[in-house]
Amino acid sequence: MTSRFYATYTSPLGEIQIESDGEVLTALDFRESRGDAADKSHSDSETLLLRDDKSLSSGDKAGLHIFDEVKTWLDAYFSGCQPRHTPQFRLSGTPFQLIVWEELQKIAYGETATYGQLAEVVAVRRGKAKMSAQAVGNALHKNPISLVVPCHRIIGSGGQLVGYGGGLQRKEALLALEQGRASWLDGCRIRSVPNVR
């Protein structure tokens, strides 16, 4: 039986659902982006829904120290500072998706790349002359660990913001945050938050 553990994190841009297998981060996304996985029935798994700071104490089932790591990462990220330590995570997907997500992680905090640029890199990795930007976009849509595996850093060829599961307003806010131009930050303190829900 597979165990799945869930916690929520309230960010300035909405509630984030975090999933772990008890050892590493397995999913992280804005709650309304893909539906509430914790509310789904898992016949082959044990589901424990943990909420708020109660989920982050060391006394919880299995310790679940991964939730502490993720909360620390998210706190730093949403304060407008690049997190120093990335929580341990495990990605599950097709071989193609895994290559796309691996290359995606190489895009630095505060930087962006286009779907076409990412497709070129993936094509080289796969020993192909070309790769469809649309195929890369489909793999990005399946990314289970948003923010940590930064699909929001991929933009359209003309610099336009397109295709983010969390919504384009949220994508714009995340990029502004990383580039130090978020009007809702005062240094590393949050002032007021744009309405992105």
Where are these regions (language model features)?
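DNA-contacting interfaces and partner/effector-binding or oligomerization modules
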Residues: 1-27, 34
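Nucleic acid-binding interface residues in structured DNA/RNA-binding domains
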Residues: 7-9, 72, 79-197
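Compact structured core domains
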Residues: 20-86
